[in-house]
Amino acid sequence: MPIGVPKVPFRSPGEEDAVWVDIYNRLHRERLLFLGQGVDSEISNQLVGLMVYLSMEDNTRDLYLFINSPGGWVIPGIAIYDAMQIVPPDVHTICMGLAASMGSFILVGGEFTKRLAFPHARVMIHQPASSFYEAQAGEFILEAEELLKLREILTRVYVQRTGKPLWVVSEDMERDVFMSATEAQAHGIVDLVAVENSADFV
């Protein structure tokens, strides 16, 4: 039987009594954000809205984005990435579990020196795929042209943010490339790998 979203007590400043709020609302108040599903327009809009709101509330405190995502749609993923670059606070990205496809693209978009992977996390990069497998010829050509443009955008970002040469990134994106946390660090996708029982990083 599903239990729904857990609720935790929260006391607003100046209030005597705590109220019960869902755990994600409580964590958002601490500037902790979560991408724990496939990337689509709904989660993209939620995360962008939260980043903008929290930036307006206090543009000096860092944001923390925890990622455990199999990837998803390219354009909503790019929207999250762009918002991370535009909001004034630094955005830490933390990979837990899996950051695949657009999940890894968002992971690499964290502030330099503030991208982290848990020790047993996995990262996967590849090129964007088409959704028009049964399209008419004309539609397929237009889709192919758009895919090439999107691939160029993603490749350019990976090159810029990993420091790897264009030919290395292009070759890696030809197929599904899975990496361990330490391999992702060597590849420049994350800067740090968390160690067990380390000091509190939040």
UniProtKB/Swiss-Prot annotation:
EC number of this enzyme: 3.4.21.92
Family matches, as CDD domains: S14_ClpP_2
Major place of residence: plastid
This protein's GO CC annotations: chloroplast stroma; endopeptidase Clp complex
InterPro entries reported in the protein's UniProt record: ClpP, ClpP/crotonase-like_dom_sf, ClpP/TepA, ClpP_His_AS, ClpP_Ser_AS
Subcellular location: Plastid, Chloroplast stroma
Family, similarity comment: Belongs to the peptidase S14 family.
Primary role: Cleaves peptides in various proteins in a process that requires ATP hydrolysis. Has a chymotrypsin-like activity. Plays a major role in the degradation of misfolded proteins.
Matches recorded under PANTHER family: ATP-DEPENDENT CLP PROTEASE PROTEOLYTIC SUBUNIT, CHLOROPLASTIC ATP-DEPENDENT CLP PROTEASE PROTEOLYTIC SUBUNIT 1
Name of the protein this chain belongs to: ATP-dependent Clp protease proteolytic subunit
Organism in which the protein naturally occurs: Nuphar advena (Common spatterdock)
